[in-house]
């Protein structure tokens, strides 16, 4: 573990999680660029997870085993830190034993981190369950923005020219738009922002199959979405931003991922919710599905709890 000086504690922190994978290396590149843009210091976090003892294997000496894992992780952190130093990137390190998502979120809260950057493999099935669940848990639990970087983004940070901001016109979406606006202030003047709204039938309608009123409902929803997107875009254009709008019918997560691919988005920023249980199922799952499906990094921003 590393200690903070009083001067360090006054500088904003970008926290990057690593498991020493290729995707984590790409997350490091994105985190370093984000820290450079915002004048923040970079901290690299790794959690040592002691595998559960299986009944058909003799249990190792848990204390020695944990210490061996810790030493190996410290060595890898030192190697990565030296590699980054060779590129002119300064980074502090933090190591702890525990569940990765808990270690990451707790460390971010203790530092009041400006953002967490983490790699996600975007896999399905058992491999996703084992390898991708940490990212999903961090997205759901973190109070600060979380930037999830995908395997397709491996090979380094690329310039951000297009930011896609999905909106459902809620406070969560407004916070994500504010974050995107802030990020654009650090980017080249030719950067653009795309506002996207995906509308669909309420779940109550879909339970009954096709009904006549569904057609007029969708038409009205599309027109209302276009009107509200136009108003939002005009306000942003007055701030000197280049803005485009898209209103489309369909499943939100699918539409967001498809439009990001179609329009060459370099980053998606979107709101998420800190709910649990049934409310999380309906309100938080869209952001988590986008993190899995999107063709580019996704920054999720959680509305502060009242």
Identify what each model region corresponds to:
Residues 45, 94-96, 126-129, 149, ...:
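Structural motif
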Residues 27, 73-76, 176, 225-228, ...:
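Hydrophobic alpha-helical membrane-association signature
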Residues 1-12, 33-37, 101-156, 258-306:
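Gly/Ser-rich helix-loop-strand patches that form or flank binding pockets
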Residues 90-92, 145, 192, 242-244, ...:
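Conserved beta-strand segments of alpha/beta enzyme cores
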Residues 1-10, 23, 30, 60, ...:
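Structural beta-alpha unit
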Residues 2-61, 87, 159-213, 235, ...:
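Small/aliphatic-rich secondary-structure junction motif
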Residues 62-75, 213-227:
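A short acidic, glycine-rich active-site loop
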Residues 18, 95, 120, 167, ...:
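Conserved residues at beta->alpha junctions
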């Amino acid at each position: 573990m590393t200690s903070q000086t009083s001067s360090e504690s006054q500088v904003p922190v970008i926290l990057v999680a690593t498991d020493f994978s290729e995707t984590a290396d790409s997350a490091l590149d994105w985190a370093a660029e984000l820290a450079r843009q915002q004048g923040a210091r970079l901290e690299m976090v790794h959690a040592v997870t002691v595998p559960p003892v299986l009944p058909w294997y003799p249990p190792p000496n848990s204390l020695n085993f944990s210490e061996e894992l810790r030493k190996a992780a410290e060595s890898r952190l030192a190697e990565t830190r030296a590699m980054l130093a060779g590129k002119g990137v300064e980074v502090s390190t933090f190591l702890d034993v525990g569940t990765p998502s808990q270690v990451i979120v707790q460390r971010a809260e203790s530092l009041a981190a400006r953002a967490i950057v983490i790699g996600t493999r975007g896999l399905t099935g058992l491999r996703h369950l084992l390898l991708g669940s940490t990212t999903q848990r961090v997205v759901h639990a973190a109070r600060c923005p979380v930037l999830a970087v995908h395997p397709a983004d491996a090979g380094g940070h690329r310039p951000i020219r297009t930011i896609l901001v999905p909106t459902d016109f809620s406070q969560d979406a407004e916070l994500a738009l504010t974050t995107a606006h802030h990020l654009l202030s650090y980017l080249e003047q030719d950067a653009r922002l795309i506002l996207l709204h995906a509308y669909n039938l309420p779940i109550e309608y879909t339970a009954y199959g096709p009904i006549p009123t569904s057609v007029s409902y969708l038409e009205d929803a599309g027109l209302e979405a276009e009107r509200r997107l136009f108003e939002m875009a005009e306000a942003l254009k007055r701030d000197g931003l280049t803005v485009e709008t898209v209103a489309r019918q369909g499943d939100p997560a699918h539409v967001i991922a498809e439009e990001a691919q179609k329009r060459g988005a370099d980053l998606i920023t979107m709101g998420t919710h800190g709910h649990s249980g049934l409310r999380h199922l309906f309100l938080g799952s869209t952001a988590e599905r986008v993190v899995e499906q999107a063709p580019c990094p996704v920054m999720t921003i959680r509305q502060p709890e009242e």
